[in-house]
Amino acid sequence: SAAYRTTRSSLRSLATEGLELISGRDCAALDIGCSDGTLLSFYPRWVDRFGVDPLDDVDQIGDWAWSAKAPFPSADLDRAFAGKKFDLITAASVLEEVNEPRAFFARAKSLLTEDGVFALETLYSPMILTRTAANVFAGGVASVYSISVLERILRDCELKIFRGSLTEKDGGSICLFITHAESSDYDFDP
């Protein structure tokens, strides 16, 4: 993921925005689909960095971050984390490859601290379809979502979206910041 400037910029933005939401404390961050650790490298040293990815790129991550070559979720990761909680979880360009999104979100929720943030960037179907981005579908993605479908899946998993934005990544993506449904820490009250 470090090979392209636009990808690095997008990952830096996701890491920075997520960290700003929980700033002012020591924290632990998990990057799902971390590839070569590019997103993790944008965190300051005081962040405990963890990355998981089923591909060989994860082997490039040095001792500066804990990493595992494993799919998410998996029994191996459950054993490795053994009750660990994360203040910030990120997943960029991962949801498109997930066959069971409810299991994915449920496991992420179980790893999130009470006031934690889950930053998700994924392809956004209205933008992909209106731009006729056929290369997205030719690439073999498992799914592409609209905001209403994502909201429904997240609601089923007792999570909620509290901030979002559209991005140009991969022809049209959406960046969402998610937390526990019962949390009011990030509610906007004018």
Locate each region found by the language model:
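A short glycine-rich, Lys/Arg-flanked "PGG" loop and its adjoining helix->strand segment in the class I
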Residues: 102-117
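Flexible, glycine-/basic-rich loop-and-beta segments that form/coincide
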Residues: 170-190
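A conserved beta-strand element that flanks and buttresses the S-adenosyl-L-methionine
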Residues: 90
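Extended interfacial segments that mediate partner engagement and assembly in macromolecular machines
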Residues: 1-59
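Hydrophobic adenine-recognition pocket in adenosine-nucleotide-binding enzymes
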Residues: 94
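Conserved S-adenosyl-L-methionine
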Residues: 159-170
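Conserved SAM-binding strand-loop segment of SAM-dependent methyltransferases
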Residues: 63-77
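Short, glycine-/aromatic-enriched active-site segment of Class I SAM-dependent methyltransferases
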Residues: 118-143, 147-151
